[in-house]
Amino acid sequence: RRVLFRSCRTSLERRGDKGTGWCMAWKACLWAKLGDGNHALTLLKNQLRLTREEACSLVGGGIYPNMLCAHPPFQIDGNFGFAAAVLEMLVQYEEQKIVFLPALPDEWKDGMAEGVKAPGNITLNFKWKEKRVTEINLKSPIDAKLVILYNGMEEEIVLNAGSSYQKTLI
């Protein structure tokens, strides 16, 4: 897996950050998956550059005044990809593991997320301060056994259908 991540990083570095809206969103998702939230945020900020509706350019991305992704013609991939990248920076789920703040940018040292859905329709609500998780609330409509990773800690939990798991950290 490390070899694949290293190869992905090298490919992203060589290709650079320029591209259309959907392409920048995709690259932001990949940088977040690699754990580099600062680079992912740079791409998202580039995607939020306002562009003129009458301008037709195949490079540079940006958004139209109505907040739709600029890529002649408009493609929803950029908007959905932008949201996916933000979530990928805040929480990742893989093989029954939920990782909180895996790629948190330095600029987002305090915050919260509510209503994030993980596979199995598990609802995640969490807060952080100074880049450390301070509260976790999980709710599942089904029985679930999973591992949560936060603040360098790993914890195995069991969720019973309809019940909540809550943790407050100091």
Where are the regions a protein language model picked out?
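Active-site core of glycosidic bond-cleaving carbohydrate-active enzymes
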Residues: 1-93, 134
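Beta-rich accessory regions
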Residues: 1-23, 32-40, 113-170
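Short alpha-helical interface elements
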Residues: 52-56, 111, 151
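Catalytic cores of secreted or luminal carbohydrate-active enzymes
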Residues: 73-124
